[in-house]
């Protein structure tokens, strides 16, 4: 029986200068070091091809791609350069993603926004682990969280998230910290959002469990239908029970309660 063939696509922007070819070689070399098992491909099927797309510039390209997006029932994510027609009951989040992850376009971000809209109870204390642009922390605050601690390992993303928190007028509700783990949090919280990767979630699952109150909710995404089962299998051992699984294309979000 033949195995399915998967195509994995990486997208990025490189300046067109005399070092571009060197940068491309380095990128390909890094991709080539990834184990086939992590990519869920056959070692014999590994093949890297490169396509070129000319853009006017990163800022101009992002402004063409990132537009106002409606997610779920009432969440609207808009960049500063776009307009939105606000409807009664809408929760409008203004995000300039910069170089950080979290424009609202990615499937895993949309899944987390849908889960927040469905499950967040006003007044909760929340943690956004791997906040990126800050979009999920801001969504949690606008949906009624009393306090949100957003943590991020990338210093540049920390600054992007802080700017977006200010853009939405939520400095009194959201604190953004440069940290590597939810173990950074001192007292237990009611909600942890982790839109990162399956590997990072599994590596920090015990710390996430310790950060949550009994009955607290974990919203985990950034995983695909291929590696979500790896996370799901580990949840009971960490003291979680599954509540729901959401999918969007190949992407998955898991909701689980700490017992």
Regions found by a protein language model. Give the residues of each.
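Conserved beta-strand elements of the Class I
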Residues: 93-94, 127
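Core SAM-dependent methyltransferase catalytic element
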Residues: 241-259
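Conserved short alpha-helix immediately C-terminal to the canonical SAM/SAH-binding motif I
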Residues: 156-160, 200, 227
């Amino acid at each position: 029986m033949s195995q399915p063939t998967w195509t994995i696509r990486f997208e990025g922007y490189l300046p067109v200068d005399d070092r571009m070819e060197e940068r491309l070689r380095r990128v390909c070399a890094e991709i080539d070091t990834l184990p086939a098992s992590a990519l869920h491909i056959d070692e014999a099927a590994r093949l890297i091809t490169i396509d070129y797309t000319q853009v006017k510039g990163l800022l101009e390209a992002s402004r063409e791609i990132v537009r106002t997006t409606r997610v779920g029932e009432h969440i609207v994510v808009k960049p500063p350069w776009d307009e939105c027609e606000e409807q009664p009951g809408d929760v409008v989040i203004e995000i300039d993603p910069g170089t950080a992850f979290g424009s609202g376009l990615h499937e895993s971000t949309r899944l987390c926004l849908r889960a927040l809209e469905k499950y967040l109870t006003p007044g909760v204390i929340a943690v956004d682990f791997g906040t990126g642009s800050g979009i999920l922390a801001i969504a949690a605050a606008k949906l009624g969280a009393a306090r949100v601690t957003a943590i991020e390992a990338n210093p540049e993303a920390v600054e992007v998230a802080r700017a977006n928190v200010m853009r939405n007028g939520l400095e009194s509700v959201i604190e953004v910290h440069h940290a590597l783990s939810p173990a950074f949090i001192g007292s237990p919280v009611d909600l942890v959002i982790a839109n990162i990767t399956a590997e990072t979630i599994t590596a920090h699952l015990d710390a996430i469990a310790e950060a949550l109150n009994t009955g607290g909710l974990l919203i985990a995404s950034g995983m695909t239908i291929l590696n979500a089962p790896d996370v799901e299998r580990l949840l009971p051992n960490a003291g979680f029970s599954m509540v729901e699984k959401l999918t969007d294309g190949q992407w998955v979000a898991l909701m689980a309660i700490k017992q």
